[in-house]
């Protein structure tokens, strides 16, 4: 019967499993934010304000992440710029 199992349609994931996956992503995101310094949201807003002087972007177009290693901290800044026409 193995060959017939191959042709059976794959069932869509249940809404419970989709909700569980989404919740795990949210929890992981919140845990990563817990270890960030207090000044990071203010810094992100100030960077957005400076970029807006030159380019029209939204708040969601700038992501800032602080990674800490043993002896070094890395501030990663990702800015999605609009396409030039």
From Swiss-Prot:
| Cross-referenced HAMAP family | MinE
**Record's protein name:** Cell division topological specificity factor
One Pfam family named in its UniProt record: MinE
Family statement drawn from the similarity comment of this UniProt entry: Belongs to the MinE family.
In terms of Gene3D superfamilies, this protein maps to: Cell division topological specificity factor MinE
Q: Write the record's keywords in alphabetical order, separated by commas.
A: Cell cycle, Cell division
Tell me, in a sentence or two, what this protein's role is: Prevents the cell division inhibition by proteins MinC and MinD at internal division sites while permitting inhibition at polar sites. This ensures cell division at the proper site by restricting the formation of a division septum at the midpoint of the long axis of the cell.
NCBIfam families assigned: minE, PRK00296.1
Q: Which gene encodes it?
A: minE
Q: Which GO terms describe its biological process?
A: cell division; regulation of division septum assembly
């Amino acid at each position: 019967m193995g060959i017939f199992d191959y042709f059976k349609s794959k069932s869509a994931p249940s809404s419970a499993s989709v909700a569980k996956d989404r919740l795990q992503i949210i929890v992981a995101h919140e845990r990563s934010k817990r270890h960030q310094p207090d000044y990071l949201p203010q810094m992100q807003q100030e960077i957005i304000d400076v970029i807006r002087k030159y380019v029209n972007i939204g708040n969601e177009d700038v992501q800032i992440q602080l990674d800490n290693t043993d002896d070094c901290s890395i501030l990663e800044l990702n800015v999605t710029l609009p396409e030039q026409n």
